[in-house]
Amino acid sequence: MAKVFVNKRKVITTTSDVVTEEVVTEAVRLHMSKLVKNYIESEDMYLSQHEVLKMAKKDSWKPDNRLVFNYAKYIVDTFTGYQIGVPVKIKHEDENVNEFVADFRKINDMEDSEFELAKMSSVFGHAFIYVYQDEYKQTRATYNSPINMFIVHDNSIEERPLFAVRYTFNENNQEGIGQVITNDELIDATFTTFGMVSFGERTQHIYNSIPVVGLIENEERQCIFESVKTLINALNKAASEKANDVDYFADAYLKVLGVELQEEDASQIRENRIFNLWKNGDGALPEVAFLEKPSSDTTQENLISLLK
């Protein structure tokens, strides 16, 4: 029976409070296989790397426009601006507390961090604040995306956080580094792309609880544009095909029926843009026209209007 499972993109374990390499390995593998792909898809959409740009290329002689309507970024930036465009203000009746909070927020540039956390939470559905001590023993805080960090919860009714994992890989490297973060210690660890975890040095921390806090966009931990991803992709495809049709008609082939053109005749027509054709005896009247495929302009416009 699996010791770790996912419920609403929350990683949960059925084991005790003991953090072992076996449990962490299972959690990392689950994170890699079940969650990371969707996070990267959401990040790509926010960064304008949409599905239409990744489709197979068409033949070189065919129009191949790739248009992106980045409604994902528009939705996230608009919502984040409304949510936290005005920075958070924190006050306390005790002046000493006010001073401490002001210093902490200044050192950690919390206005920027809070904005990035709000944006990140909208893109991924949730995000994390990680608190740590720097080399000067000052308490610092930074933000982390769920692509390389997650919290494992117990399976009690409260789903209490048991430990957090933070890991990263260098490009084209099969081995990564990171930490396993518990209530009382930081465990250095190595990670493989297959999800194997090996513990290293252990260091006690001062917080008496996991110094990682999750911020959620909604209970389901869905990104803010999750429900319209398919509509955005369909709009990109429809607009790209419409642009392809415009290019097709601009480069349409000319057909000339009922008269034999020599090479110099064709060249003269192209340069002067004039046709001077006449009926030759009892033969058919010469015909000049562009080759056209059936137009789907109205259908495409209706589809684009519907998707918008």
Model-derived features: positions:
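N-terminal start-of-domain structural block
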Residues: 1-39, 191-224, 230, 235
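Short, well-ordered loop/turn elements at secondary-structure boundaries
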Residues: 123-126, 158-161, 250, 285
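Extended, charged amphipathic alpha-helical segments
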Residues: 198-308
